[in-house]
C-alpha cells in the first residue's frame, strides 16, 4: 500500500538588497518594488497596488466580476504561507483600454507591509 502525502510548498525569498513587500500576517515575501506598476488601484477593502509579478502566492479559480473599470475575469490570490486572501489576478479584461492589466496582480495595502531597504 502506498501512502500519499501532501507535498511541501517551498517559500521563495526575494533578494535582500531590494526593497520588497511582504505579507503583513506572516512576513512571507510577495513582490519586489521594481515590479510595482501602480499605486492607484482600489481593492475590495481599500487601496491596492498593481504588480507585474509576485511570489509565494496561490491563485483560485477565475470568475467574471464587474469592477470599477468594467467587466474582468479575475482570480483571487492568497498567501501560500498563511492562506490569507491578498487580492486578485487579472486573467482577462473585456474592454480594450483595460487589456494592460491581464496577467497582473492586485494586492491590497491592508495585507502587505514594506520590508527591507525603505529608509
Curated annotation (Swiss-Prot):
Residues 19-116 form the Yippee domain. PROSITE patterns: YIPPEE. Zn(2+) binds at residues 23, 26, 79, 82. It is found in: Nucleus, Nucleolus. Coiled coil: none annotated. GO terms for cellular component: nucleolus. The keyword Zinc applies. It holds the Pfam family Yippee-Mis18. Keywords: Apoptosis, Metal-binding, Nucleus, Zinc. GO terms for biological process: apoptotic process. GO terms for molecular function: metal ion binding. Belongs to the yippee family. May be involved in proliferation and apoptosis in myeloid precursor cells. This is Protein yippee-like 3. The gene is ypel3.
Amino acid at each position: 500500500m502506498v501512502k500519499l502525502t501532501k507535498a511541501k510548498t517551498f517559500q521563495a525569498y526575494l533578494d535582500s538588497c531590494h526593497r520588497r513587500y511582504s505579507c503583513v500576517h506572516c512576513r512571507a515575501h510577495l513582490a519586489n518594488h521594481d515590479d510595482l506598476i501602480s499605486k492607484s488601484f482600489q481593492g475590495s477593502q481599500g487601496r491596492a497596488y498593481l504588480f507585474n509579478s509576485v511570489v509565494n502566492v496561490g491563485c483560485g479559480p477565475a470568475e467574471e466580476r464587474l469592477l470599477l473599470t468594467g467587466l474582468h475575469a479575475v482570480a483571487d490570490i492568497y498567501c501560500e504561507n498563511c492562506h490569507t486572501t491578498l487580492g486578485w489576478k487579472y486573467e482577462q479584461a473585456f474592454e480594450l483600454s483595460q487589456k494592460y492589466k491581464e496577467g497582473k496582480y492586485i494586492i491590497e495595502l491592508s495585507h502587505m507591509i514594506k520590508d527591507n531597504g525603505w529608509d
